[in-house]
Amino acid sequence: MANKAPSQMERSITTIIDTFHQYSRKEGHPDTLSKKEFRQMVEAQLATFMKKEKRNEALINDIMEDLDTNQDNQLSFEECMMLMAKLIFACHEKLHENNPRGHGHSHGKGCGK
């Protein structure tokens, strides 16, 4: 039996994991993001979704502090995924924002547009 190609969602999950590791292994522990790595990832990978936040160093620091639940000044993959979940939820809501059908179910242009 031939291997089935990964689905779009499976590829998206793999991309998120790979992107996290692309930044997490730059300095310190290879499986956590330092403040510098987190800022670099937000600026490069979330530039459209977080365009206001990425220009504000203090806001980036506040976001990291909120995500850093064990207060070790690093973000584990799990802690970082809390941000991804919030962004996905906010993006979903934004897609429905101007739709007269609400969640009835058509999507607009997308987040960051």
UniProtKB/Swiss-Prot annotation:
Residues with PTM N-acetylalanine: 2
KW Membrane (keyword) present: yes
Domain of life: Eukaryota
Effect of residue 107 to A/F: Reduced histidine methylation by METTL9
PTM comment, free text: Phosphorylated. Phosphorylation inhibits activation of tubulin polymerization.
Residues that, per the record, bind Ca(2+) 2: 68, 70, 72, 74, 79
GO molecular function list: antioxidant activity; calcium ion binding
SMART domains named among the record's database cross-references: EFh (SM00054), S_100 (SM01394)
Residues bound to Zn(2+): 21, 31, 92, 96
Family matches, as InterPro entries: EF-hand-dom_pair, EF_hand_dom, S100/CaBP7/8-like_CS, S100_Ca-bd_sub
Residue ranges of domain EF-hand in the record: 13-48, 55-90
Cellular compartment(s): Secreted; Cytoplasm; Cytoplasm, Cytoskeleton; Cell membrane
Gene3D superfamilies tied to this protein: EF-hand
Membrane association type: Peripheral membrane protein
Keywords, in A-Z order: Acetylation, Antimicrobial, Antioxidant, Apoptosis, Autophagy, Calcium, Cell membrane, Chemotaxis, Cytoplasm, Cytoskeleton, Immunity, Inflammatory response, Innate immunity, Membrane, Metal-binding, Methylation, Phosphoprotein, Repeat, Secreted, Zinc
Phenotype when the gene is knocked out: No visible phenotype. Alters response of phagocytes to stimulation with bacterial lipopolysaccharide (LPS).
Residues given in the record as Ca(2+) 1 binding sites: 24, 29, 32, 37
Record-annotated disulphide pairs: none
GO biological process: actin cytoskeleton organization; apoptotic process; astrocyte development; autophagy; innate immune response; leukocyte chemotaxis; leukocyte migration involved in inflammatory response; neutrophil aggregation
Gene Ontology terms: cellular component: calprotectin complex; cornified envelope; cytoplasm; cytoskeleton; extracellular region; S100A9 complex
Pfam families per record: S_100
Free-text function comment from the UniProt entry: S100A9 is a calcium- and zinc-binding protein which plays a prominent role in the regulation of inflammatory processes and immune response. It can induce neutrophil chemotaxis, adhesion, can increase the bactericidal activity of neutrophils by promoting phagocytosis via activation of SYK, PI3K/AKT, and ERK1/2 and can induce degranulation of neutrophils by a MAPK-dependent mechanism. Predominantly found as calprotectin (S100A8/A9) which has a wide plethora of intra- and extracellular functions.
PANTHER family assigned: PROTEIN S100-A9, S100 CALCIUM-BINDING PROTEIN
Assembly and binders: Homodimer. Preferentially exists as a heterodimer or heterotetramer with S100A8 known as calprotectin (S100A8/A9). S100A9 interacts with ATP2A2. S100A9 interacts with AGER, and with the heterodimeric complex formed by TLR4 and LY96 in the presence of calcium and/or zinc ions. S100A9 binds quinoline-3-carboxamides in the presence of calcium and/or zinc ions. S100A9 interacts with amyloid-beta protein 40. Calprotectin (S100A8/9) interacts with CEACAM3 and tubulin filaments in a calcium-dependent manner.
Protein name: Protein S100-A9
